[in-house]
Amino acid sequence: MTFEPTETLRDPFVLYGESFASRLLLGTARYPSPATLQAAVEASRPAMITVALRRQTAVGSGDGQTLGGETFWQMLRTLGVPVLPNTAGCFTAQEVITTAMMAREVFETDWIKLELIGDDYTLQPDTLNMPAVAETLVKEGFKVLPYCTEDLVLCRRLLDVGCQALMPWAAPIGTGRGAVNPHAMRTLRDRLPDTPLIVDAGLGLPSHAAQVLEWGYDGVLLNTAVAQSAYPVNMARAFALAVEAGRTAYLAGPMPEREVAQASTPVVGMPFWHAEGAEDRA
């Protein structure tokens, strides 16, 4: 059988009933320039690009959005990639809801990445109030993708209020540490086998992305790992390849881990294979 590199495209990434060819989502902040951002998007071909709604449009904001205001949004639209607005910087339920409503009007989409921050030092999500906010957004007709922790109880509660996909972190935002609690993340995947899970925050290397895809996670969202690398365009492409490799490996069915060595070469047919103790030495 001939391997087709595109065979993972027959394994669509489905969110809220919509299929996407890519399992990578890409943030648009903190790039060296708009041109670099545009090239990174073209190199990785993400399923969506995330955008923070600005209440004021300042030129030269220091996060790569130096075109400022409407010009920046027009540039994003020319990329031909669906936009996923987020509620970054919101610390209260009312801020989230207001920002989401404004984003829906500006970007003409019901998609929203829910970010409700509980601590401005760790940027940890407000896990206590998030389910209620998510429920309100769902009732308002939004397709909610909540940024959350790997806490199983929280994730179940978010599903109970109507979220159809979750975005647990691997580590705090911008740390680039990869999965700091592999046991909890793998447990979450095992206990929610039918829920789309997108790892959001904490990934720093393409190998981190490949790892969580190998565990069965459905996708990853990246920003700092690409935007703050030495060569963002190359890193964007590297992450896209890692995501495809990780998903392909998961579908291939990795071998089980073992505590002891097991010979990969059979001893039958080898010189002295029938001698006493040969199998023990193999």
Swiss-Prot record:
Active site feature: K113
Residues at which 1-deoxy-D-xylulose 5-phosphate binds: G174, A201, G202, N223, T224
Keyword Repressor tagged: no
EC assignment: 2.8.1.10
GO CC aspect terms: cytoplasm
Enzyme kind, highest EC tier: transferase
Main location: cytoplasm
Protein's cellular compartments: Cytoplasm
Pfam families xrefs: ThiG (PF05690)
Keyword Hydrolase: no
Highest taxon of the lineage: Bacteria
Pathway terms, separated by semicolons: Cofactor biosynthesis; thiamine diphosphate biosynthesis
One Gene Ontology MF term: thiazole synthase activity
Biological process annotations from GO: thiamine diphosphate biosynthetic process
UniProt entry keywords in alphabetical sequence: Cytoplasm, Schiff base, Thiamine biosynthesis, Transferase
Family named by the database record: Belongs to the ThiG family.
Assembly and interaction partners: Homotetramer. Forms heterodimers with either ThiH or ThiS.
Name under which the protein is recorded: Thiazole synthase
UniProt organism field: Cupriavidus metallidurans (strain ATCC 43123 / DSM 2839 / NBRC 102507 / CH34)
Gene from which this protein is expressed: thiG
